[in-house]
Amino acid sequence: MPHKKYRSILLAGVIILVVLIAVATRLGSNGNTDTAEESAEISQGVAFLTGLEAKDPADVDQILKEQRLQRLQEMRDERMRQLESGEISVWSLFEDYVLCGDSRAVGFSFFGFLPEDRVLAESGATILKLEERIPDIVALNPSNIFLCYGLNDVSIGIWPTPEDYVAQYAEIIAEIQAQLPDANIFISSILPARDPAFQKSTAWYNIPQYSSAVKGMCDSTAHCYYVDNDAIADEYASLWEVDGIHVQRDFYPHWAANLITEVYSVSLEDEDAQTTQAASSGDSGASSAEPDN
């Protein structure tokens, strides 16, 4: 790669690093900025990127990508920690949204966490009810749509395989996106069932397979994101009701924190992508203005 273009890659890396550090600083518990510490971090980052000049250009791109992803994950983990500790009220971050789902999702409004007009959930609901709710969702015109289905879908017998399920789910998602193309859709993984729930339906043993299929669908669908609840389901297993199906009031803040952290993660990734694109555009302009050495 020509020297000038190679240096542009390093410059782009510096810009991205500075932006990520600036955003991370805003996550401080008291909102204070330690200028000296921030400057030291930036200086270390610049020194690191300058040292990359001795490396192969193909390796540099991968190293910078890994650094960005690591930093984004650290910021995501810090936000989750702040939400879990109560430093930030998770409910204050639910803005311009709609949440749809089954009886488990009903708890968000039943326990008074979120307003009823933003929680379109019913006991026994499946994604077929979601399809019926599309006009209501469109009327609210939300930026973020949270979908919390799956418990009844797995046991009802309409979709005998995970593949059958996501095939119809994808069609419904496409219907929503056709009318709300700018909305982000966040699909909650299916919370597990626990004993004695399996006495009611052994199909719930297959919940992990259905969730995995939903993840695959999200991975291949633009503006559709999978929210993995496995970690919080394991950590707060004691917050399931005695029926092994529903969850107690105290579980909802943890579930909400997981949902809203994914929204935050997507916003970070979008900001990172925009910064990278801006840096690349600047590189293209410089390349056209000056010949490579």
Please give the residue ranges for each predicted region.
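Acidic/histidine-rich helix-loop elements
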Residues: G112-L130, S155-P162
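Alpha-helical scaffolding within the catalytic cores
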Residues: I127-V138, A170-E175
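N-terminal secretory targeting modules
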Residues: M1-F94, F110, V266-N293
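N-terminal post-signal-peptidase region of extra-cytosolic proteins
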Residues: E78-G86, G124-I134
